[in-house]
């Protein structure tokens, strides 16, 4: 593949004079380019929705969401995966981020790590990949060998696969069941795909993980009711969520949360139904953790 023909590698005619611009104009040019990202992502929403449903199906069948990428793309996957346990109360390892070159590549580039298809396969083998897992390959260029190797192995293993790229009709798209390709155009700094391409990938990952967790029962209304209250700020947020979801006073909310070890869902159910903590947990379990279903039945 001639990399120079990739949209993400071409020069942007709107930013040819970056090195001659005064600072206010310099940052204005970057901002003008960033405004294009949301529209590019909007054009991919039908495919993002398919990925959300596939991610939720993986979780409901006992599988995992596995992101894999190199460089910025890999770091974004690790970032999204690492936020899921504190945000949604899921165990570490339910959403996994793999980066070419291993964890050390998060802080320092590992030269050449992305160039091996076998490394992508090996990293999935090391995770004991199962067919109920969803594998999401991330590559702004759409041609990273590490990601191609991983997606190919995942598909051969019976997994549903998703490719996220910022170039149309990319090699990784051809390896995936679902292709998400927000074409954001040439970067303000030629080839620096940590810019618009990275922003677009982050937006897509936000929707995949959050949407999947909504459909996995981790959200009530728009509240992260399975959040782990692990510090003072989050204990306060837990209390506010109970108040906002039920209309009770803060003091009563705090009393209920103490009875549930600061778990928000059973506290809300207790406030709205009069159940005690044990009965509230039992009812939630009977409805697979979906608070709305527990309240309505």
From Swiss-Prot:
**Any one Pfam family match given in the protein's UniProt record, by short name:** GKRP_SIS_N
- What upregulates it? Induced by MurNAc 6-phosphate that releases the repressor MurR from the DNA. Repressed by MurR in the absence of MurNAc 6-phosphate.
The gene name on file is murQ
Q: Can you tell me where the transmembrane regions are?
A: none
Which UniProt keywords are given for this protein, alphabetically ordered? Carbohydrate metabolism, Lyase
Q: What's this protein's function?
A: Specifically catalyzes the cleavage of the D-lactyl ether substituent of MurNAc 6-phosphate, producing GlcNAc 6-phosphate and D-lactate. Together with AnmK, is also required for the utilization of anhydro-N-acetylmuramic acid (anhMurNAc) either imported from the medium or derived from its own cell wall murein, and thus plays a role in cell wall recycling.
One example GO MF annotation:
carbon-oxygen lyase activity
Give the species: Salmonella schwarzengrund (strain CVM19633)
Self-association and partners: Homodimer.
Residues of the active site = 83 (proton donor), 114
Q: Where is the SIS domain?
A: 55-218
Enzyme Commission numbers on file: 4.2.1.126
What name goes with this protein? N-acetylmuramic acid 6-phosphate etherase
């Amino acid at each position: 593949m001639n990399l120079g023909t990739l949209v993400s590698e071409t020069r942007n005619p709107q930013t040819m004079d970056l090195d001659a611009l005064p600072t206010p104009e310099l940052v204005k040019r970057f901002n003008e380019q960033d405004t294009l990202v949301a529209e590019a992502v909007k054009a991919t929403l039908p495919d993002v929705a398919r990925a959300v449903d596939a991610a939720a199906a993986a979780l409901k069948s006992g599988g995992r969401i596995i992101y894999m990428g190199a460089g910025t793309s890999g770091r974004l996957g690790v970032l999204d995966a690492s936020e899921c346990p504190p945000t949604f109360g899921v165990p570490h390892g339910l959403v996994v981020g793999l980066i070419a070159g291993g964890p050390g590549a998060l802080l320092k580039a590992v030269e050449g790590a992305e160039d091996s298809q076998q490394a992508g396969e090996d990293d999935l083998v090391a995770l004991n990949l199962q067919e109920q897992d969803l594998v999401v390959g991330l590559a702004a260029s759409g041609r990273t060998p590490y990601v191609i190797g991983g997606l190919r192995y995942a598909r051969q293993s019976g997994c549903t696969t998703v490719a996220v790229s910022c170039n149309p009709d990319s090699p990784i798209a051809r390896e995936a069941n679902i292709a998400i390709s927000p074409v954001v155009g040439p970067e303000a700094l030629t080839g620096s795909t940590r810019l618009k391409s990275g922003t677009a990938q982050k937006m897509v990952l936000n929707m995949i993980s959050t949407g999947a967790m909504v459909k996995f029962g981790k959200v009530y209304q728009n509240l992260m009711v399975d959040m782990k209250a692990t510090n003072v700020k989050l204990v306060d947020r837990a209390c506010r969520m109970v108040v906002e979801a039920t209309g009770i006073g803060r003091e009563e909310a705090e009393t209920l949360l103490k009875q549930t070890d600061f778990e928000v869902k059973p506290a809300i159910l207790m406030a709205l139904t009069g159940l005690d903590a044990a009965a509230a947990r039992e009812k939630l379990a009977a409805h697979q953790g979906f608070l709305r279903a527990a309240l309505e039945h």
